[in-house]
Amino acid sequence: MKRCIFAIMAAMLLCGCSIKEEPDTLAVSFFDVGKADSFLMTCGGKNLLMDAGTAKDGKKVAKRLEDMGVESIDYLMITHFDRDHAGGAAQIIQDFDVKALLRPEYMKESDESAACMAAAEDRGVKVIIITSQTDIQLGSTKLVIHPADKVYENDASNNSSLVTEVFHGNNSLLFTGDIEKERIADIKYELNDAGYDFLKVPHHGKYETMLQEFFNWVGAQSAVITSSKKNPEEQETIQALEDAGVKDILLTRGGEITLQSDGRKLDFTQK
């Protein structure tokens, strides 16, 4: 039997064939922190925490990470410095060994941003300001991070959100922070791809008139909206997703969502 296996492998090599290595599993946990964002992305022993909810959410996110066995964080990405994304960052930096903090160039002045940067300085965290397209690798997952190429006159903080493409095997995911109509109109000129399998819907499901065109362009089959029962997504946004052919629309107000990619398909669970 061993001779047979070796013969098959030798034949494949002679024919110019190679045995394709399966990618590590990519997992993304969308924490239930209400109308706020905090996601843990893991692949190949590396991880990235995208946003940390509000200041009140900081301890909740930290406890959830501890329960998941997380001891250190390779990358803490703050998409933008609004309170519902950056508020819990100081707590995370204090509680975990954070290797690097990724942030946009535009930083809204607030108690949350000041606390985040003070904690990073106190703990000696490497701060990387994203001013141009930046690629990072989490195991077999490639992330392409896009900063805004200007400071927008309206909603400067939201529109300065770092937008991230995630590529894992044949799967592609798009995370959009809280971009608003001005950046949504520009986003297709920033990105390298057209057509994604998954979309993190911008700004907690707030409806904008150009969302229908944007959702059609993205072409996702599944989407997550971060919302709460007290502050739900707008129904017009749900309708626009459905009209764009999105089959699976998941809401964090229904509980924590876990996305898993094997490089070919995406699976979701919610608790």
Protein language model features and the residues they cover:
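Non-globular, low-confidence helical/coil segments that flank catalytic cores
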Residues: 2-3, 13-271
